[in-house]
Amino acid sequence: MKTYSAKSHEVQGDWFVVDATDKVLGRLSVELAKRLRGKHKPEYTPHADTGDYIVVINADKIAVTGNKAKDKIYYHHTGYVGNLKSASFEKMKETHPERIIELAVKGMLPKNPLGRAMFKKLKVYTGSEHPHSAQQPQPLNV
């Protein structure tokens, strides 16, 4: 008996919608990364994209525990000398709340072309509306 190796074009990704209201950032991100990789499926193959599509709504209502709301800092560099920018979790939540979930999940995916393809299957929106109703996403309890 040979070991089954799934091909990316053979596995179809299902669509799921996740409500991030009052969910803890890390615990939600772990589950999203696992489903984007496809590790919850029996036909999971490390070298193929076997994951699902995930739509996250209400990203502006995400929660963190402890003092992380004040203490957690997000850094990025503009590319110019001396231009390391930083923003706290609270400021990021005010300006770009969807980026909080995106950065957390992106850090949990592989750092290669396959990981970037998996990341494209994640759609994050601040409100409760999303433009993917044609794909009929199923609600996912995390």
From Swiss-Prot:
CDD domains: Ribosomal_L13
Disulfide bonds listed in the record: none
InterPro entries referenced in this protein's UniProt entry, alphabetically: Ribosomal_uL13 (IPR005822), Ribosomal_uL13_bac-type (IPR005823), Ribosomal_uL13_CS (IPR023563), Ribosomal_uL13_sf (IPR036899)
Family annotation (NCBIfam families): rplM_bact
GO cellular component: cytosolic large ribosomal subunit
Any GO MF annotation of the entry: mRNA binding
Keywords: Ribonucleoprotein, Ribosomal protein
Its job: This protein is one of the early assembly proteins of the 50S ribosomal subunit, although it is not seen to bind rRNA by itself. It is important during the early stages of 50S assembly.
Gene3D superfamilies: Ribosomal protein L13
GO biological process: negative regulation of translation; translation
Entry's family note: Belongs to the universal ribosomal protein uL13 family.
Subunit field text: Part of the 50S ribosomal subunit.
SUPFAM superfamilies for the chain: Ribosomal protein L13 (SSF52161)
Protein name per UniProt: Large ribosomal subunit protein uL13
Organism: Acidithiobacillus ferrooxidans (strain ATCC 23270 / DSM 14882 / CIP 104768 / NCIMB 8455)
